[in-house]
Amino acid sequence: MKIIGKFPKTRLRRVRNEDWMRRLVAENNLSTNDLILPIFIREGKNQIEKIKSMPDVYRYSIDKIDMIIDKALNLGIPMVALFPYTPNKKKNNLGSEALNENNLICRALRKIKKKNRNIGIMCDVALDPYTSHGHDGILKKNKIDNDETLKILVNQSLLQAQ
């Protein structure tokens, strides 16, 4: 092969000509190290509830979390993300349950951390699981009040980080 010029005037493309070569020299690989396992949690004991809107996905009561975490660790998954299901009776316009130190997320976090496992835990800092209107913020005059929402989200973050 004769090279006509030098970089930057000549840019060789031979490693991009064929699909197999592009796959061979690709910079990115996906492994279990790149995965985060979502865990949907609910109130109760000994509960595994099918989520109708998501095939083959379930909500688990806190006492079942160990089983899920063990599976994640055995598969080499380094992190889980917790998503709470809040019953309507615990929801209100201000999302007050988000600031309850004994809410579902906080109890699940304490249970996972108590075992001191080598797994990362991610939680959603959001109000939509806790508000009766389903928005991710405090509504005032049919608009989200960002300042009030941020105050609550800061406190929710601090609570989850404990």
Predicted regions and their residues:
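Alpha/beta enzyme core
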Residues: K2-T10, E18, E27-I36, R42-Q162
